[in-house]
Regions:
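Short glycine/serine/threonine-rich phosphate/pyrophosphate-binding segments
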Residues: 147-154
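A charged, well-structured terminal subsegment
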Residues: 191-201
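A short glycine-rich beta-strand->turn/loop micro-motif centered on a GG-aromatic cluster
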Residues: 141-144, 162-177
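Active-site acidic carboxylates
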Residues: 1-109, 113
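Glycine-centered short loops/turns at secondary-structure junctions
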Residues: 61-64, 136, 162
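Internal catalytic-core helix/loop-beta-alpha segment
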Residues: 96-144
């Protein structure tokens, strides 16, 4: 890995991205289905959820804008797409399906945005970017699942919309350690600041 780091550095990747206020928090898809190893979960996701409880408490204490995302398909699958074709089980995530509900310990409060999405990114086809912009957010802390999937997609889009993404490394999780580690490395090189919760706060 040291050789890879040197290669990236020589080519100009991995430049430090300094967080600047105001801050916001995005929690990506921490729903029951991704907390359950029998459905879409496993790996280090339970620990990431527990760490996000503390991160969310701090965000609320500081008065930061907080947004959550859920995957929600129409009851009749009228909005079924290539994402659902690639991962058919996701089509079971409906508005009232328990698997699509945000885990109780991170339940949204009044004034927090809940984005319903059918694509990996929490930004694609949603009001999230406008909502964050209206609240003046410059640095967006990101937690959620999975690191290699919807978290990464949301981080890339956050950067593309002009926000500074800060991936809180112990508050994101994946069902397998390899993809988790590889995507944290890659996001740190190209798209985001990446650091654990204690350092981020």
């Amino acid at each position: 890995m040291e050789q890879e780091i040197q290669t990236y550095a020589r080519q100009g990747f991995g430049t430090a991205l300094q967080p600047v206020a105001p801050y916001g928090l995005l929690i990506v898809d921490f729903v029951n289905g991704f907390a359950d190893p029998a459905q879409f979960g496993g790996g280090n996701i339970p620990g990431a959820i527990a760490n996000t409880e503390r991160l969310l408490a701090t965000a609320r204490e500081q008065g930061w804008p907080v947004a959550h995302s859920r995957i929600v398909f129409a009851d009749d699958n009228a909005d079924a797409n290539v994402f659902g074709l690639k991962v058919p089980g996701l089509l079971a995530l409906k508005e009232d399906a328990p698997a699509s509900a945000i885990v109780p310990q991170l339940a949204p409060r009044a004034g927090e945005l809940v984005v319903r999405k059918t694509e990996p990114s929490a930004f694609f086809g949603t009001q999230l970017a406008a909502w964050l912009t209206q609240r003046g957010v410059r640095t967006l802390l990101v937690a959620g699942a999975t690191t290699s999937g919807c978290v990464r997609a949301s981080v890339v889009d956050a950067m593309s919309h002009g926000f500074r993404p800060l991936v809180v490394s112990d508050c994101v999780g994946d069902r397998a350690q390899g993809p988790h580690d590889a995507n944290l490395f890659d996001m740190a090189q190209k798209y985001a600041a990446v650091m654990p919760r204690e350092q981020a706060l």
